[in-house]
Amino acid sequence: MKRISLIGGTGSIGVQTCDVIEQHPDLFELEAYAFGTNVEVATEWINRLRPKYVSATSIEVLEQLKPRLTYEPLYFIGPEGLKECATAERADIVVTAVVGAVGLEPTLAAIQAGKDIALANKETLVTAGHLVKAAVKEHGVNLLPVDSEHSAIYQCLNGERREDVSKIILTASGGSFRDRSRDELADVTVEDALNHPNWSMGAKITIDSATMFNKGLEVIEAHWLFDIDYNDIEVILHRESIIHSMVEFKDAAVMAQLGNPDMRGPILYALSGPKRLEIEGNKRLNLKEIGKLHFEEADFNRYPALRLAFEAGRAGGSMPTVLNAANEVAVDLFLNGQITFLEIERLVEDAMARHEVIAEPTLAQILEVDRAVRQQIQQGIEGGE
């Protein structure tokens, strides 16, 4: 029996993780469950899976939750609650499904407590890859990818020698606006952006997919997960989202992992791999029905977010933290109708241009850079810049 702590239980990855746990009660048990403000979704899964520890973002949210539960777990709140759930004594593995840089501290706490990590929170590696990798090595835990692209690479590398890898190829759907020109993006709405052609995801990651910042963050994540140089990471557009990513080896052989878009597959593989388990309702891939798969260049002129991500990754140090923080604030501003879609990229590029890189930032410095970037952008918007 593998006991699981889930950080970010009400989002898309969190809900699908709960589904996977419920489908395999003989193998998995939910030990701790942390969520933000979605009491309705939290109530359903907490009552169904009955974790020992429950954490919410605030006391107000917790007070809404308590009368809805059919039993009495141990309650926690806020950032400390995330850490309590991440370090729950009996937990074997922590699924970090929370969105944004808020996932960094509980992830580090879990590693220091000797927990394996099923990483769906890409911002953790983007902002503090050097700290996370050092902690993983020091405490001897496993860092397992949940993102479909990184799970695909992880599976392709099973049994292979790292020195035989020539490059990795991340596939990207192109997002909601893949068939629109740059000029046509000037007036797109939030509703347009949230209509992803292939995946069912949360609002933030759906916007990131439309800008391609999501793929950019995945480039930086891949650099840390697989110890690969940025020059050996390629991004290509693949509109069907059937090939989740590929690995090219030095003999020119290419291995790819295919499947219908369903995040429960990567989640389950992170929890059970290399053993493979069935997933109820997982549609089998029928290539005869699909007929054709398409691939295109991911043009940096069409997708400046990709260029910015590679630049931030190569700059290293604190620059990826700036990229991530600026993007998180900009996406929130767009979702709230305060800026246009194309201004997301501009705000990120401006923040990076202002920043003086700290080469080997401490956790405290990362958190301070994150805070300062967010504050600066918010003040600029309020001041009418």
From Swiss-Prot:
HAMAP family: DXP_reductoisom (MF_00183). 1-deoxy-D-xylulose 5-phosphate binds at K122, S148, E149, S173, H196, S209, N214, K215, E218. SUPFAM superfamilies: 1-deoxy-D-xylulose-5-phosphate reductoisomerase, C-terminal domain (SSF69055), Glyceraldehyde-3-phosphate dehydrogenase-like, C-terminal domain (SSF55347), NAD(P)-binding Rossmann-fold domains (SSF51735). Transmembrane segments: none annotated. Gene3D superfamilies: 1.10.1740.10, NAD(P)-binding Rossmann-like Domain. Belongs to the DXR family. Pathway: Isoprenoid biosynthesis; isopentenyl diphosphate biosynthesis via DXP pathway; isopentenyl diphosphate from 1-deoxy-D-xylulose 5-phosphate: step 1/6. It catalyses: 2-C-methyl-D-erythritol 4-phosphate + NADP(+) = 1-deoxy-D-xylulose 5-phosphate + NADPH + H(+). One of its GO terms (biological process) is isopentenyl diphosphate biosynthetic process, methylerythritol 4-phosphate pathway involved in terpenoid biosynthetic process. Mn(2+) binds at D147, E149, E218. Its EC number is 1.1.1.267. It comes from Exiguobacterium sp. (strain ATCC BAA-1283 / AT1b). This is 1-deoxy-D-xylulose 5-phosphate reductoisomerase. The keyword Oxidoreductase applies. InterPro entries: DXP_reductoisomerase (IPR003821), DXP_reductoisomerase_C (IPR013644), DXP_reductoisomerase_N (IPR013512), DXPR_C (IPR026877), DXPR_C_sf (IPR036169), NAD(P)-bd_dom_sf (IPR036291). GO terms for molecular function: 1-deoxy-D-xylulose-5-phosphate reductoisomerase activity; manganese ion binding; NADPH binding.
